[in-house]
Structures are given as structure tokens and as C-alpha cells.
Amino acid sequence: MADKVRRQRPRRRVCWALVAVLLADLLALSDTLAVMSVDLGSESMKVAIVKPGVPMEIVLNKESRRKTPVIVTLKENERFFGDSAASMAIKNPKATLRYFQHLLGKQADNPHVALYQARFPEHELTFDPQRQTVHFQISSQLQFSPEEVLGMVLNYSRSLAEDFAEQPIKDAVITVPVFFNQAERRAVLQAARMAGLKVLQLINDNTATALSYGVFRRKDINTTAQNIMFYDMGSGSTVCTIVTYQMVKTKEAGMQPQLQIRGVGFDRTLGGLEMELRLRERLAGLFNEQRKGQRAKDVRENPRAMAKLLREANRLKTVLSANADHMAQIEGLMDDVDFKAKVTRVEFEELCADLFERVPGPVQQALQSAEMSLDEIEQVILVGGATRVPRVQEVLLKAVGKEELGKNINADEAAAMGAVYQAAALSKAFKVKPFVVRDAVVYPILVEFTREVEEEPGIHSLKHNKRVLFSRMGPYPQRKVITFNRYSHDFNFHINYGDLGFLGPEDLRVFGSQNLTTVKLKGVGDSFKKYPDYESKGIKAHFNLDESGVLSLDRVESVFETLVEDSAEEESTLTKLGNTISSLFGGGTTPDAKENGTDTVQEEEESPAEGSKDEPGEQVELKEEAEAPVEDGSQPPPPEPKGDATPEGEKATEKENGDKSEAQKPSEKAEAGPEGVAPAPEGEKKQKPARKRRMVEEIGVELVVLDLPDLPEDKLAQSVQKLQDLTLRDLEKQEREKAANSLEAFIFETQDKLYQPEYQEVSTEEQREEISGKLSAASTWLEDEGVGATTVMLKEKLAELRKLCQGLFFRVEERKKWPERLSALDNLLNHSSMFLKGARLIPEMDQIFTEVEMTTLEKVINETWAWKNATLAEQAKLPATEKPVLLSKDIEAKMMALDREVQYLLNKAKFTKPRPRPKDKNGTRAEPPLNASASDQGEKVIPPAGQTEDAEPISEPEKVETGSEPGDTEPLELGGPGAEPEQKEQSTGQKRPLKNDEL
């Protein structure tokens, strides 16, 4: 038995060690549970967080505002963000960057680069020699790419979120415009990597808005489809989205609400910024007219003046949305000349007349892509700040033909709230109610390849093939597999955008390269040589369009199959064990797995994709990997495969149906042979049927990016280091400013305290003069040399002054604490003395305290009284300017020692059972002696709660010093004369615990 116990002890230790490790991991994880979202707009951003106990909250910035301008000011030795950077735009417009998101993923020849240069001529733009991307040249030493600037903004947004959440945050969902292509989305992901953020998803801002709308109206969604149109006009662009809300049946969670993006239309340059720029141009013209005869320079040539005019134009646009006219005025616009001019709403609408004509464009695009009419749209909801312009609402209302426009959504914060809900859903730390999101592909993607064919004997030609990989408005995230059946050697294929005819000529120029990637395969021929006896099933390329809308090539495989005889003896013990475990947890072996045997590589179920019709004789097949399907009765069934495009897909479907029928009829399967052949004789039944063995060989892949080359890893590492250095510099600057402010505040506060009576009472004139002189010298040093002083020097100067004033502050603080501490000590001494007196009056037959215990308490009481009187007498002899001998910490120590003794006796009284009284001949308890005092006769020991008076007495507990640690013991509160000694039963029938004042 002892040996068995010894064997179990190590196991228990291991179990406890594992529990400790798991608890440590959970505690560490609890510190990083918060997630965030960043609604990255052209003009401003909104940040939201979710953390335990704080569901979906918008983060306030340092100015306590819910919206932060996306502006960065970069100087040689400091950076400014948000409102601080906006104010710096007037002083240093060249170093202040705004609207830089318009340059993400753009090369030098993109029309948006020229448009940005025309709008903001104060910025000097240079170009990367390898990638031909844009860089901001701030000075000869400072140069930043748009990705780096965006990384700074994302890092700043994280700092705001961390300050608000009071814990570190790494996981984030970032919104991007729906019209961002692959290059622009990859640029945002690179910026997030530079900032050290883990991007859970890049969510389209229109999808985030639709999700926020659906989450807060979950009860209104039912099985009937509801089509809602969201019209979002922001600062830089306009997007119109048609969303269908409906309850659908899912395999994982049953009936759940779903939003599906049905149609999208957009205008990249239609927004509030263009209106402000036209107002700025109008104001600049008015100012030049006012100074026409003064030979003054054109105000457009002054960057500071133009920055002031742009700020005034922004304010003017907002005011004119609610007023018919307004007076624009700027003090000291240029050359100390003030500007003042009246602008009416009619003038503003005339300036932007062509912009208002473009308002219905995105609506028509969205309807066309969704293949819907306006009659099918139930409601049109406004989103975005620019939709507050009255003329925009008038034109839009006329275009959609509705009675009114919906304004029942927070136009500024809806996207941020939807994105943070998605962040919580993607995070493993939170459990949210499911909401199915089916986003849509805006730009179709296809695969192109060229193959040599023999049209006539001896005549060869090249045939160009195209296969649509992801069709326009198709759902994503999604995986696709394309199979090349007629290649036995290395070859190349190309991934390009599909038909972009829905874009205008100017939009196509802004879009950039329509070629994405060239894929070069290496090792195809070697794979055929490795398996000469196997039948080739083609070269399979696996594609993934992830949640962020970013396309990737997961892998390319060469697949071979052959028929082998199935023998039960060939199965090893390990294989049998694995099959048993799989059947237990996976519900049994699938027909495909049985057919392919143990050497197979499980593939996702494949189905023909749209637009994959081949020419006669073509064997290239496009398939879709199965994901958790959503049953939606409103969607039309997929088109049936035609011709020779998907022969393998048809066979797979037939085989699947056959497997299902076999599973439903096991008796028929047992009687019938393979392929429906009649049952074989008994002798032949012993032979095992042949099975397929599949072999998969990984093919080497070389990717040549054509749209925009990714930033090399070494360059990316340099950018990461650059941003980290800037962040460290900012932190050091903040630390230095904090030290300087602390030193300055200490000097002013102490100089003021020297003239207060309580400080003059405990100090001599010489002491105050010494301190005052040191403070004045430190103040002079801070003004003269403090500008160049380091953080360490400032902290050392502050420590020196605090040490000088330490004695003075100590004497004042002690005198402030004396009345309260001495009063508490007196109360405790009085209550303890009363408690001791009451304990000694307990009759001997009921006494629960020993003489040693009561003597010990009496000794502590007497020693405390003696210490107090002696210390007070000694303190009275000392002058107030000397260090006191009566210290508050000593008073607290004496109180703790006394309280510890009393608490011990109270605990003993609480848990000790009363002694049973002897009974007389009549069966009644003996009365107390006649000579007992009145107080003795009235005294009664109350038994603990839950025990009867007849219970057996328990042994006397050992003396345990409870509450011996400082701060764990409260002063005793004993009742005065007349306190009720007996306990009253509570309503529950139990007796409440004994209190200190009831003995």
C-alpha cells in the first residue's frame, strides 16, 4: 500500500504542475484579451475596442474626442498626430501629411499621384527606383513612404486604444474602401506589419457598416429577404451598397441572421474633400481680388495661407449645410492681412454642380451589379459626413425615388462598431452571437495559360485559355482549385483581373496594372519520372481569397493514382489504431478514404466554378473547395456543367451520389459486387477488391508579382526599425517632458508651502531660507539650462530638492496624523480594558479563557498605556522643528499588537462550545450559587451558530496569532453598558456570528 501511495505522489505533483502552468497561461492571456478596430477614413479615423466587461466602445483620444484626424506632422526630432498635427498644418504645411491613403499601392504614372500633387503642391514627392512607388521628401534627412506614414497612424491608434483599455492590444480589424484592389490591400497589410499589429481581417467599410446595422436590428431579420441600400459619401470617395438581410440555416448554429453584399457602386474622387477644395479655390480668388491693386503675390503660392483657407473651407461647408449664407473670415491670412468674405449656399452649390450630377452614378452601378431594380429596395440609408450636404440629399432622393432617406444609423461610427464586432467574433477570447457575413468580390480574377496543340498532323499552334477563378460579386472568403490535365513538364500560368468593363476609362487608369502574378512551376517533369507506373490526375493549384480579400496561391501539387490490391494483413497495428480513433471521433471512414487507402492526402470537396466552360477536348478543370455551406433558398442553383469542361466533376458527383445510396442500403451493397456486378461465388468472395492509392508530389513555385512588387523583407525590416526608433524617441520625449513638468511643479508648490502656517510652525527661519534659495536656483537652472537637460538630469535635480525638503514634509505629515491615530489608540485601549473586565467576571464554571491568556492581554494593555504616556511626555519636551519621537507608524504597530491579542480571545470565544451544567434530581439544571452577584446571574455564554447548548465541549484551541500582518486587523468596536448579550435568531433559523461588542 505504501508503495502504491509513493507511486501516486509523483503523478499528483505532475498534475498540479500542469494546472499551475495552465493557470499561468490563462492569467497571461487575460492581460491581452482586448481587441480593437480602426475605421480608417480619408479625413479622420474612429477606434473601437472590446475587452472583458467593456462591450464595443468607441475610444476617446487625448482631447476626449471620438473622432481623430488622420494627419501626421513629421519634424526632425518630433512627431505630432491628430488634432495636434492639424494645428501644426498651419505652421509647417510641408511636414504635415494628410490624405496619404490615396497614394497607397500607386506607382509614379498613376493619375491619382498627379492629382495629389495638384491638390497639395507643398509636398515634395520622390519615387522608389525599384518599385516606382511614392515617397514624401520632408527634408534631406527625412523620407517616408505612404505605408510607413500609415504604420505610424495605426501605431498611434493602438496607443489610444491601449490607454483606453488599460492593457496591451495586438489584434485588430481595419476597414478599407471596397474599391481597394490587391496592391492597395497588400499595402495596408504591410503598414500594419510595420506597426506591429496582427490584422485579424481587412473588412470593407461598407460591409462593416452593414454588419453594425444588422447586429443592432437582429430581431427585425427573418426568413424574408430584406434589401437595404447604404449610400456612403465620405471625405474622399462615395460607395453605394445593396445588402440583403435574411435568416438562413447553418450547419454549425442552426438558423442565424446573414448579410449578403449583392451590389456595389463607387466613385473614387466624389466626396467632401473635392467640395472643400473648390471652396478653397473660391476663397483664394476672393482674397486676390481684394488685394488686386496692391501688387501682392498670389495667395495660391503661399502654402501656409492655402492651409488656412482649406481649414476655413471645411468649416464653411459644414455651416452652409445648415445656413443659407455665412461669413468666411481669417485673421492674418497672408502678410498680416485679414480676410473676410460672404459665401452663400447657392454659390457653393454652383461651384459643385458637376459633383452633384455624379451622385446617382454609384446607385446605378450598384443596381446593375446586383441585377435589381429600385422597387426591390426597401430603404436607402445615408452614411458618411458628406451626405449631410442638403443638395446631395435632394439629388439622391430624386434618384432613388423614395419618400425619404433613412438616417437611423450613426453615420460616423457605424463602420467602427461593425468592425469591432467582427474583431470580437474572430478573436478566441470572446463569444458573440453568430452573424453570417457574405462579402462580394468586386474585381473578377481569372487564370490564363497557353498550351501547344496539334490542330492537324504535323501542324502545331499555341492555344490561349482563360478560366474565371473568382467571378464578380461572387462570395468570399473562398478557396478554389484549378487542375491542369495535359501538362507533363514545367510550365507557367498567369493570374490576372477579369473583365473590368464596368469601370470607366479614367477609373481603369487609376486602377493600375490588370496583371497580378506570373506563376512558374518547377518539378512537374520530375514528379512524372518519380511515379512512372501511376496514372496522372493533373497538376492542382490551390487558391485562397481570404477574409481580407487578398488572393494567395497556397500550394501546387502533382497528383497520381494507381490500383492496388487491398490486403488486411498489410495493415499495421498503428494503422488499425489510427483508423479506430478516427472512427470514434470522425464518425467513421468516408467512402473516399476507404477507396484511397492509408497513403492518400485528403482533399476538400470540389465543385465546378462559374465561367469554366472549355473548348471541346480541353481537360483543364476549375473546382471550388467546399466550405461550411449556408443553405439559402433564395439563391439560384449553380449552373450545370456543359460539354467537356468538367468531366471529372461530374464523375465526382455521380460517385458521391452512389456512395450515399450504398450507405443507405447496406444489404444491397453486401449482395452486389463492385460496379453493380452480380454476387460472386463463395470462393471468389474471399478475394479483396482493388483500391486506389493516391500519391501527391509538391511542385516548386516561383511567383513574379506584376501589379506592384511587394516590399523586400530587408526593406520591410528597415521600415519596422525606423518606426520603432521614432516611437522610442517619442516615448523618451514624453518621459523628459514629464520629468520637467514634475520638477517645475515641485518648485512652485514648495515655494508656496514655505509661507503656510503649518510649515512655518515646524521649521526655523534659517531652514526656510535654505530651502527657498535652493528652489530659486533650481528654477533659474530650469529656465536657462533645462531646455538642453536630459531626463536623467531633470530627475536627479528633482530628487535633490525632495531630499532637502524631506524632513520638513515629514514633520508636517506626522503632525497631521497624530490626532486620528491617538484617538484610535485610546478607543482601542478603552474597549480592550472593558473586554478584559468582562472576561474576568465570567463565572468559573463558564470560563473559557485561561488565566495566562487574560494576564497576557492585561500586560499588553498596561505596556501600551505606559508607552503612550511616556512618548507623549517626551514629545512635549522636543521643539516642533526637531524630528518627532511620536511616530504614526509606532502608534499603528502598538494598535496591531493589542488588537492581535484581543482577536485571539474573540476567536476562541466564537468557536469554543459552552460547558454543560450539572442536573439535579428533578432533571432541571442547577441554579447558580445564591451568593453570586447580579451580573454573574445575568451573564450567559452564547453558543456558536448552528450548535445546541447540549453539544459536547471541544478541546481548547491552540493560541494562533491571527491578523498579525499589518493592515489585516481592524480596531475593535466593543459595545458600551447595556449591550444585549444574547444573539437573536435570524429568519433562516440560524444564529448569526458573535460580534465583538456582544461579550
Swiss-Prot record:
CDD domains in alphabetical order: ASKHA_NBD_HSP70_HYOU1 (cd10230)
Region (Disordered) location: 578-694, 909-999
Gene3D superfamilies: 1.20.1270.10, 3.30.30.30, 3.30.420.40, Actin, Chain A, domain 4, Substrate Binding Domain Of DNAk, Chain A, domain 1
Expression triggers: By hypoxia and also by 2-deoxyglucose or tunicamycin.
Leader sequence residues: 1-32
Motif extent (Prevents secretion from ER): 996-999
GO terms of molecular function: adenyl-nucleotide exchange factor activity; ATP binding; ATP-dependent protein folding chaperone; protein-folding chaperone binding; unfolded protein binding
Location in the cell: Endoplasmic reticulum lumen
Modified residues (Phosphoserine): 567
SUPFAM superfamilies: Actin-like ATPase domain, Heat shock protein 70kD (HSP70), C-terminal subdomain
GO biological process terms on file: cellular response to hypoxia; endoplasmic reticulum to Golgi vesicle-mediated transport; negative regulation of endoplasmic reticulum stress-induced neuron intrinsic apoptotic signaling pathway; negative regulation of hypoxia-induced intrinsic apoptotic signaling pathway; response to endoplasmic reticulum stress; response to ischemia
The UniProt record lists the keyword Nucleotide-binding: yes
Tissue/organ expression: Highly expressed in tissues that contain well-developed endoplasmic reticulum and synthesize large amounts of secretory proteins. Highly expressed in liver and pancreas and lower expression in brain and kidney. Also expressed in macrophages within aortic atherosclerotic plaques, and in breast cancers.
Biased composition (Basic and acidic residues): 611-626, 641-672
Chain positions found as N6-acetyllysine: 883
GO CC, any one term: endocytic vesicle lumen
Disease: Immunodeficiency 59 and hypoglycemia: An autosomal recessive primary immunologic disorder characterized by combined immunodeficiency, granulocytopenia, B-cell and dendritic cell deficiency, recurrent septic infections of the respiratory tract, skin and mucous membranes, and disturbed glucose metabolism.
Similarity field: Belongs to the heat shock protein 70 family.
Subunit structure: Part of a large chaperone multiprotein complex comprising DNAJB11, HSP90B1, HSPA5, HYOU, PDIA2, PDIA4, PDIA6, PPIB, SDF2L1, UGGT1 and very small amounts of ERP29, but not, or at very low levels, CALR nor CANX.
Function as written in the Swiss-Prot or TrEMBL entry: Has a pivotal role in cytoprotective cellular mechanisms triggered by oxygen deprivation. Promotes HSPA5/BiP-mediated ATP nucleotide exchange and thereby activates the unfolded protein response (UPR) pathway in the presence of endoplasmic reticulum stress. May play a role as a molecular chaperone and participate in protein folding.
Annotated protein name in UniProt: Hypoxia up-regulated protein 1
Naturally occurring in which organism (per UniProt): Homo sapiens
